[in-house]
């Protein structure tokens, strides 16, 4: 299982700690004992909701936002791989053939690229290119988002945690595709037909 988060750092860390402690203390219900990924997502959601309510109760008179969201993905032996988006309220939705991806955090700059280019049948190689361009667009448009980018690719039925890869500022491949993307956009814009005269009246 892989769990990603965005939002209030204290809330996210508290959720991770509670989930980890449940495993270490061999509690009856933890991420190692739940029968399905849906149950795992429900467990994360419950933990998130409890953590948020507790934090808000302590800091009633402040304007601090304690909201965090999570993406849970992975595979349980004998079942299909799944990805769940867990909202700050604790409820969750599953990725489907119609909505094959989720995003966390600052997504408005990169999401249009994924919406235009990605579908359920896309290859992993194509998906990787689109994801990296999506990150590049976000990094260029929002100063609060930056390198590195951590990449983790899970292969169906491997039941093994991937090693993962960290892309930093000196990564040659990332530099190459972001330059190709910028050049390609300018080229396409220059090739588009000029707007009609009526647009300029």
Task: Give residue spans per PLM region.
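N-terminal nucleophile
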Residues: 1-201
